[in-house]
Structure formats: C-alpha cells, structure tokens
C-alpha cells in the first residue's frame, strides 16, 4: 500500500506477500474501500491494538496459518498477518473473504 512503508513513526517494517498484493488488486476491482484495510495496516504497523470491532485474534487449529493472526476489515473481509517482534517486521499474508482464505 502506497505511503505506509515510508512512515517514520511505524514500530514495524511492513512486508506484503505477492499473494496479498494480488488479492488487494482483486478487491479494488470489486469496489472494496481499500482505505479500510490501509487504516488497519497503519495501526498494526504502529504497534497499536485494534478496536474490538475488528475481531483481531490468533488463528488456532490451522495448519496452513500456524502462528498467524486474523482480523475483520468487514464481516466477510479478512486480513491475515504475522508479527515478528524480534525483527520488528509485520507480514501481511492474505486478504479476502472467509471462503477464499480459510476454507480451501
């Protein structure tokens, strides 16, 4: 996402997977408001805790997303990410609907 990587007040360096980038392009074509996900990315990269409404939680009992977190941008729009606190990097892994991400 343009502009976020250059912000000096970020606690974590932002890294996007190629899959995440392609999923964002798809969501943009679908008319989704990418400002919503950009705001979440900014909060997470600053080390801020997300509001309860985002339902941020660790993914458990999932072999594919071991040690990852997920939050809700909208009721059926998820953001999967991982924070490496030792290296101060936040990885944005995937974004999309429940069926696209969790039920493969």
Predicted regions located by residue number:
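A short, surface-exposed loop/turn module that caps and links secondary-structure elements
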Residues: 45-72
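Residues that form or immediately flank small-molecule/cofactor binding pockets and catalytic motifs
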Residues: 19, 64, 97
């Amino acid at each position: 996402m343009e502009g976020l990587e250059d912000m000096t007040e970020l606690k974590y360096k932002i890294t996007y997977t190629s899959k995440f980038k392609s999923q964002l392009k798809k969501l943009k074509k679908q008319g989704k408001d990418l400002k919503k996900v950009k705001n979440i990315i900014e909060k997470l990269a600053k080390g801020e805790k997300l509001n309860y409404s985002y339902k941020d939680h660790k993914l458990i009992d999932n072999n594919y997303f071991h040690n990852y977190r997920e939050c809700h941008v909208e009721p059926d729009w998820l953001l999967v990410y991982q924070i490496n606190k030792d290296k101060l990097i936040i990885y944005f892994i995937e974004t999309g609907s429940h069926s696209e991400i969790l039920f493969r």
